């Protein structure tokens, strides 16, 4: 799962929907 934080930084997360801001 690839998500983006509030600053548009690409954050790679395995098996989790948690976003590190």
Swiss-Prot record:
GO terms for molecular function: porin activity. Keywords: Cell outer membrane, Disulfide bond, Ion transport, Membrane, Porin, Transmembrane, Transmembrane beta strand, Transport. Disulfide bond interactions within and between MOMP molecules and other components form high molecular-weight oligomers. The keyword Disulfide bond applies. It is a multi-pass membrane protein. This is 40 kDa major outer membrane protein. GO terms for cellular component: cell outer membrane; pore complex. The keyword Transmembrane applies. It comes from the Bacteria. The lineage of its organism: Bacteria, Pseudomonadati, Pseudomonadota, Gammaproteobacteria, Pasteurellales. It comes from Actinobacillus pleuropneumoniae. Structural rigidity of the outer membrane of elementary bodies and porin forming, permitting diffusion of solutes through the intracellular reticulate body membrane. It is found in: Cell outer membrane. Its main location: membrane.
């Amino acid at each position: 799962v690839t998500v983006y934080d509030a600053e548009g930084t690409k954050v790679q997360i395995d098996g989790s929907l948690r976003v590190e801001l």
